[in-house]
Regions:
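Conserved catalytic neighborhood of penicillin-recognizing serine enzymes
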Residues: 84-85, 96
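N-terminal Rossmann-like or analogous alpha/beta NTP/dinucleotide-binding catalytic cores
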Residues: 75-80, 102
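Catalytic zinc-binding patch centered on the HExxH motif and its immediate surroundings
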Residues: 22, 81-84
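His/Glu-rich zincin catalytic helix
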Residues: 1-70, 92-97, 105-107
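Short, solvent-exposed loop/turn segments at the edges of secondary structure
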Residues: 26-28, 75, 86-88
C-alpha cells in the first residue's frame, strides 16, 4: 500500500467507523466490513461458532436467497468472500466501482 495515499476516517452516529482510501488507478471498488468478534470470544461448547456465523451469509439473506448474491456479484464481474480470525470476522466484495451499491445492499 502506498503510504502517501491518505485514509479518511469517519465515525457515524450509530458508532460505525468508516475508513475510506481512494485509489484511482483502476475502476474497481472493494468494500470490507469488519466485526470485532472471532474465536477469542468463544467459550467451551461453542468453539467454531464465529466461523459458522460467517458462513451463514453465504446461505442467503432476505434480500438475496441462497445462491443469488454470488450470481449477482459474478454477473457484474466481481468477487466476494469472508474470513474469521482470533479477534475479527470480515466480509468483502470487490466490484466495478459503479456497482458498489450491490455490496452495500448485502451488508
Amino acid at each position: 500500500m502506498d503510504p502517501l495515499i491518505p485514509i479518511r476516517k469517519t465515525v457515524l452516529d450509530n458508532g460505525l467507523t468508516v475508513l475510506l482510501r481512494e485509489m484511482h488507478h483502476a475502476p474497481i471498488a472493494s468494500f470490507w466490513m469488519w466485526y470485532r468478534v472471532g474465536s477469542r470470544n468463544e467459550r467451551a461448547g461453542i468453539t467454531g461458532i464465529s466461523h459458522w456465523v460467517e458462513h451463514m451469509l453465504f446461505k442467503g439473506t432476505p434480500s438475496f436467497p441462497q445462491g443469488e448474491f454470488d450470481k449477482a456479484i459474478a454477473r457484474e464481474g466481481g468477487m466476494f468472500n469472508g474470513m474469521t480470525w482470533i479477534d475479527f470476522t470480515t466480509y468483502f466484495e470487490t466490484l466495478p466501482a459503479d456497482r458498489i451499491d450491490l455490496a452495500l445492499r448485502v451488508e
